[in-house]
Amino acid sequence: VLPFRGRTLDCAGVGFSVGLMFGNGGEGDRYVGGSGFDWAGFRDDPFGVNVDFRLRAFDETPVAPSDVSALARFEFMEGLSGSQHADILNGDDRDATAIALSGAYGSVLSDDYMDMVDGLRAFINELADPLTSLGEVTSFGAGNIILGGNGSDLIAGNGGDDLIDGDMWLNVRISVRENNDGTGAEIASFNSMVPMIPLMLNGTYN
C-alpha cells in the first residue's frame, strides 16, 4: 500500500468487499469507497492527522479556498484509523439506513468480511453486543468504526451509532504467498509496497 498525497484512491470498482486505503491526510487527497465497508488509515503519518468524514469528495456545493477546502475528502468510507500521534478524527452523519444504501450494493460490514481484519469481530461484539442484546453480531452498518491509535486524540462519531476506541489501530501487511492465487505458505511479508517494488521488477516476485 503506497502513501499518497494530492491523489484520488478509488475502491469503487473492486466489488462488494472491504477496501483498506492508507494515506497521510495530505492536501487534496480523495478517498473514494463504494460498496462494502471501506477503511481510511493513517498509521504512517509523521505528525497526526485532521480527518473529517463529513467533507465529501463529491460535494455539490464547492468550498471556497480555505484551510478546510485543502483537507482530505471522503466518499462512502465507513472505517477510520488514526496515526500514532495526536489526531482529530470525525465520523460522518450516516446511520444504518444510509449505510445500507451507500454504493451500488450497500456498505454494511457483512459476516463474510468481518474476519478479514484480525480482531475486528471480537471488537465489534464487545462494543455492539451490550447495545443489541442479540448475541454474537454477524454484521455492522449502524455507523462508523473509529480507532484512534497512539497519541492524545480528539474523536467525534457524529451521526449514527458509531463504535469508537481511542487506543486500537488498523494495521495492514502484504503477504507474499507460495502460489500466484494467494494460497500456500507465506514467503515474505511487507509493511508497504515500497520495498516490494524492486523485488517485483527484478523478478523475485511475479
Per-region residue spans from a language model:
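Acidic, glycine-rich low-complexity segments
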Residues: 1-206
